[in-house]
């Protein structure tokens, strides 16, 4: 794998935010998760670790495996899985988003 994986960023944040609506949450929450996903894709880290390109379908499939929760809950669950498997994904977790009250 080469270092050009950072140019892999074909993940469309608007498309992902719309796809995340199936998990509920607010528009702000879905947009925040989508931005974190784009940052992860742009970093090239996921592709380097897993050998797979981050796509809308892949993110939605992975988040569907979570036991439940909002898009941010599901995203943070998946980031936890990636952190356990590969280490160092904590920076991509969603801590706060507009309207989260935190």
What residues fall within each predicted segment?
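Haloarchaeal acidic low-complexity proteome signature biased toward cell-envelope/secretome components but also
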Residues: 1-102
